[in-house]
């Protein structure tokens, strides 16, 4: 029985899933918008939102926690130097999911996941 089990399996084992979401979270922080399947985007929210909340309070302990979750110093620096201050006044809801049709090969539902309030330069680069 699967009582109280949350999260999607996505036909992967736990280490593959953990690595995939670590990489996707890094990509989302770096580019501020990525295109992926809708279920992955919905699950990625559960990884990225706590990271940004962590980055709102800059401390050595929080930086180490963020590094443990991302394994990338450049991502940690962007989280704490740019994204944390940007979302200081926002109480959650840092991401937006936009549906964008279906993938040609397997008809999987696709979506963009983006950080809200991202600067116009990042929006132009995404187009």
Swiss-Prot record:
GO terms for cellular component: cytosolic large ribosomal subunit. SUPFAM superfamilies: Prokaryotic ribosomal protein L17. Keywords: Ribonucleoprotein, Ribosomal protein. It comes from the Bacteria. GO terms for molecular function: structural constituent of ribosome. Disulfide bonds: none annotated. One of its GO terms (biological process) is translation. It holds the Pfam family Ribosomal_L17. Belongs to the bacterial ribosomal protein bL17 family. Part of the 50S ribosomal subunit. Contacts protein L32. NCBIfam families: L17. HAMAP family: Ribosomal_bL17. This is Large ribosomal subunit protein bL17. It comes from Aeromonas hydrophila subsp. hydrophila (strain ATCC 7966 / DSM 30187 / BCRC 13018 / CCUG 14551 / JCM 1027 / KCTC 2358 / NCIMB 9240 / NCTC 8049).
């Amino acid at each position: 029985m699967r009582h109280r089990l949350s999260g999607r399996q996505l036909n992967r084992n736990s280490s593959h899933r953990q690595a995939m979401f670590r990489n996707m979270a890094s990509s989302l922080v770096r580019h501020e918008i990525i295109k992926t399947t809708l279920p992955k985007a919905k699950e990625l929210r559960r990884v990225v939102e706590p990271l940004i909340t962590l980055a709102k309070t800059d401390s050595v302990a929080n930086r180490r926690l963020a590094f443990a979750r991302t394994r990338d110093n450049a991502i940690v620096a962007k989280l704490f130097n740019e994204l944390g201050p940007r979302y200081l006044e926002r109480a959650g809801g840092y991401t937006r999911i936009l549906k964008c049709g279906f993938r040609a090969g397997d008809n999987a539902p696709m979506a963009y996941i983006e950080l809200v309030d991202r600067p116009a330069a990042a929006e132009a680069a995404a187009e």
